A protein has these predicted regions:
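Conserved loop->alpha-helix
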Residues: 1-149
């Protein structure tokens, strides 16, 4: 489980097709406390750490995950919003984010609104009916409150 509060921005250092897509992601996390098998949200997608070094970790991205996300995201040099999994006792500042992707959205507008920004999104098909005013969504792993539908 995650909160949608981004704690680092990583960069894909290498991408290699090994059955699944193996990514090596450079990051600023102290990975000494990250076990193999731990979950890290990569732009909102819950992925499992399969290897690691001092300043990088590796994950395998399934074809199903690639097909349900913005597929150009999974390329060498791409930046990813990162969040370690929620631990008991951590501050809970966003909303519950599972990291299981339901679909994608197209950004159709971006405008300043007071001290923040208003983002217009177009969501295809069934997913749009699941979004409620004043509910929450995660966009690239970032917790956002829905103002209106």
């Amino acid at each position: 489980m995650f909160t949608g509060i981004i704690t680092d921005i990583g960069r894909i250092e290498a991408a290699e097709q090994k059955g699944d897509l193996r990514l090596r992601i450079g990051c600023g996390y102290d990975l000494s406390g990250v076990d193999l098998g731990a979950s890290i949200a990569c732009s909102g997608v819950c992925l499992t750490v399969v290897d690691k070094g001092d300043d990088w970790f590796a994950v395998d991205v399934s074809a199903e995950t690639v097909s349900r996300t913005a597929s150009d995201r999974w390329r060498e040099g791409a930046r990813l919003n990162l969040e370690r999994s929620l631990r008991l006792g951590d501050e809970f500042g966003g909303h519950i984010v599972t990291g299981h992707i339901d679909g994608t959205a197209e950004i159709i507008g971006l405008a300043p609104h007071g001290g923040s920004n208003r983002i217009g999104l177009r969501v295809a098909g069934e997913l749009g009916r699941s979004i409620a005013p004043k509910g929450s969504i995660a966009l690239d792993g970032v917790s956002l409150t829905v103002n209106d539908v």
